[in-house]
UniProtKB/Swiss-Prot annotation:
It is found in: Cytoplasm. The lineage of its organism: Bacteria, Pseudomonadati, Pseudomonadota, Betaproteobacteria, Neisseriales. It comes from Neisseria meningitidis serogroup A / serotype 4A (strain DSM 15465 / Z2491). One of its GO terms (cellular component) is cytosol. This is Methionine--tRNA ligase. Is required not only for elongation of protein synthesis but also for the initiation of all mRNA translation through initiator tRNA(fMet) aminoacylation.
Length: 685
């Protein structure tokens, strides 16, 4: 039975270039979609640019153009990059679209009618000159601890202290330079806490299509942390509004209030699909009605699991729509074992890769060969990239056709012999369903290992039968014809197995093989007495110089592109050396979060009630921007400095320690994880 499937990748933000980190997800999705289409399923792949928010608005102002003009230009650039890597969207749209506006407003109205929307008054810093509320990173001033100038409103880049924007000395707006004021504003909240029963059932449930879980095991464990145990829930309500000026969609019946980007961004999946449906005549409602029998899968990065596994399913369900069939998260990309770095030239943009003339299918293959169904980071080792592509694709796969096609063309008028009874081909066809299951379950690394093992068998057959020697021997024409026909058939089967990963090579191979297209049926069927065309070379080797030039090109882009000093490297400068004795003065301990909550009157601080094993303490931490739902941290193990001198936090109370976190390249703060088995009070060092 033909399956009906909607598939999406997370929407790239319209305020930056596409890099290889983005490509991991879109290649993973594209491989899965192409596999489904090869199997004959009706599969629609939709994506879009995520276009709303303060960063887009300010970036457009800086360029002196309208946000609409900027996002249109960025969308063209993004689509060109993805197309260059053969990402085969059925529709690549924009969240700034009439369909998205309508769906966002309709969903909001439905949630409100179901009692899931509530208005509350909150306090925020306000720029009186620009007449806008300021996110923490748009407030600067003097660090209250080390007195460094021009520090951001959430942490000091000189001494590393975290704080609230209200603690800055002589704060000013990074947008206008004006002194900000603390003002009240009415905001709208999605009552996510009331959705806990549904979310507990959905996150732990299985999809009706094949009985597999909606979420990966690692994701489900994280959901259990966020959702709490039993009838209790740790979910906090979600602020879904922002104040004007803001580039986005205005909330119905709330002048000057706009949907927060994370409300209308996932709705962009619906909008992109609706736009496609209207063009090709597909029934949109069949896919999104509450009792839909179709399948819907979201491929995302692990950093946005909260939105896709909790917020989005709840939005859909309580607005009268279906929830996703599956949400599949992947890890991050490192290069040569380290985070991508502009200074080292390993923050590689898709555009630079294409402009340097590297074959995009090399990268598609390498990334796919590293991907599995788990939420694991993958590493692009550049030397391994060269050797694996050259060995697998050129040495094992492409050479099979090159070694047999010439004899078929010259000696047998380009026509194959019927080799349906070949033992060699039987070994290849026997793996069809096993490899299909690997693709279906996103075990691409295993699929490609198995495919290359089959290629090894074929190459062993080449070496054992030596067609170049048969061609020189009298009376061996029939055997030569048989061997070369087996090899061309084997090449066809391998091409079908690799087609989801190498779509352009498969298309070029189809021309050589005189086939309309490669399908999954080619993994099980021989070609018979089929005429083929002249062989054209299908793939070149990767040269070391090409990779070296790529790295240099990305280093050069930093030197020639004006940017703030903070953008020169994604890593902060290493502090002065500390002696061993200095380090030993710091007493770091594991602590369990008993309760975490927002601090009334602060947009920056979270209050942690911690169990250190030997005693309980309260610590304030300036990480509210990174954890908008603080209750999700309840029950988590953290690392804290236990002998840090108590510090009075303005009017909020005394902080009895410091919780350790990592500052990411985009300014977010992430708590450090503790391995399973560690207990409160355990010493870290």
């Amino acid at each position: 039975m033909t399956r009906k499937i909607l598939v999406t990748s997370a929407l790239p933000y319209a305020n930056g270039s596409i890099h290889l980190g983005h490509m991991v997800e879109h290649i993973q999705t594209d491989v899965w979609v192409r596999f489904q289409k090869l199997r004959g399923n009706e599969c629609h792949y939709c994506c879009a640019d995520d276009t709303h928010g303060t960063p887009v608005m300010l970036a457009a102002q800086k360029q002196g153009i309208a946000p609409e003009d900027m996002i249109a230009k960025v969308r063209e650039e993004h689509l060109a990059d993805f197309t260059g890597f053969f990402i085969g969207y059925d529709n690549y749209y924009s969240t700034h679209s009439p369909e998205n506006k309508q769906f966002s407003q309709d969903i909001y109205r439905a949630l409100k009618a179901n009692g899931k929307i509530e208005s509350r008054v909150i306090e925020q810093l306000f720029d009186p000159e620009k007449q806008m509320f300021l996110p923490d990173r748009f407030v600067k001033g003097e660090c209250p601890k080390c007195h460094a100038q021009d520090q951001y409103g959430d942490n000091c880049e000189v001494c590393g202290t975290t704080y609230s924007p209200t603690e800055l000395i002589n704060p000013y707006s990074a947008v206008s330079g004006a002194k900000p004021e603390l003002r009240e504003s009415e905001h709208f909240f999605f009552k996510l806490g009331e959705c806990a029963d549904f979310l507990k059932a959905w996150t732990s449930g299985n999809n009706p299509h094949d009985g597999k879980p909606h979420l990966q095991a690692e994701a489900l464990n994280k959901m259990k942390e966020w959702l709490g145990e039993g009838e209790e829930t740790t979910l906090s309500d979600w602020d879904i509004s922002r104040d004007a000026p803001y580039f986005g969609f205005e909330i119905p019946d709330a002048p000057g209030k706009y949907f927060y980007v994370w409300l209308d961004a996932p709705v962009g999946y619906m909008a992109s699909f609706k736009n496609l449906c209207d063009r090709i005549g597909v029934d949109f409602d069949e896919y999104f009605k509450a009792d839909s029998q179709t399948e819907m899968y979201h491929f995302i990065g692990k950093d946005i699991l909260y939105f896709h596994a909790l917020f989005w399913p709840a939005m859909l369900h309580f607005s009268g729509h279906r929830a996703p069939t599956g949400v599949y998260a992947h890890g991050f990309l490192t290069v040569d074992g380290q985070k991508m770095s502009k200074s080292r030239g390993t923050f590689i943009t898709a555009k630079s890769y294409l402009e340097q003339g590297l074959n995009p299918e090399w990268m598609r293959y390498y990334i796919a060969a590293k991907l599995n169904s788990k939420i694991e980071d993958i590493d692009l080792n550049l030397q391994d990239f060269i050797s694996r592509v050259n060995s697998d694709l050129v040495g094992k796969y492409v050479n099979i056709a090159a070694r047999a096609s010439g004899f078929i063309a010259k000696r047998f008028e380009g026509r194959l012999k019927d080799v349906a009874d070949s033992e060699l081909l039987a070994k290849l066809t026997a793996q069809s369903e096993a490899i299909a299951e690997c693709y279906e379950s996103r075990e691409y690394a295993r699929a490609l290992r198995d495919i290359m093992a089959l290629a090894d068998i074929v190459n062993e057959y080449v070496d054992a039968n030596k067609p170049w020697e048969l061609a020189k021997q009298e009376g061996q024409d029939a055997r030569l014809h048989e061997v070369c026909s087996e090899l061309i058939n084997a090449f066809t089967m391998l091409t079908a197995y690799l087609a989801p990963v190498l779509p352009q090579t498969a298309a070029n191979a189809a021309k050589f093989l005189n086939l309309e297209a490669i399908t999954w049926a080619n993994t099980r069927e021989t070609l018979g007495k089929h005429a083929i065309n002249k062989y054209e070379h299908l793939m070149q080797r990767v040269e070391q110089k090409q990779v070296d030039d790529l790295i240099e090109a990305n280093k050069q882009s930093i030197q020639t592109t004006p940017a703030p000093a903070a953008e020169e490297s994604q890593y902060e400068k290493v502090a002065e050396q500390a002696s061993f004795d200095d380090f030993m003065k710091i007493d770091m301990r594991v602590a369990k979060v008993l309760n975490c909550e927002a601090v009334e009157g602060s947009t920056k601080l979270l209050k942690f009630d911690l169990d250190f094993g030997f005693e309980k303490r309260i610590i304030f931490s300036g990480i509210a921007a990174s954890y908008p739902n603080p209750a999700e941290l309840n029950g988590r193990m953290v690392i804290a400095v236990a002998n840090f001198a108590p510090r009075k936090m303005a009017k909020f109370g005394v902080s009895e320690g410091m919780i350790l976190s990592a500052a990411t390249a985009d300014g977010k703060l992430k708590l450090l994880d503790v391995d399973a088995g560690a207990q409160p009070g355990d010493k870290v060092g």
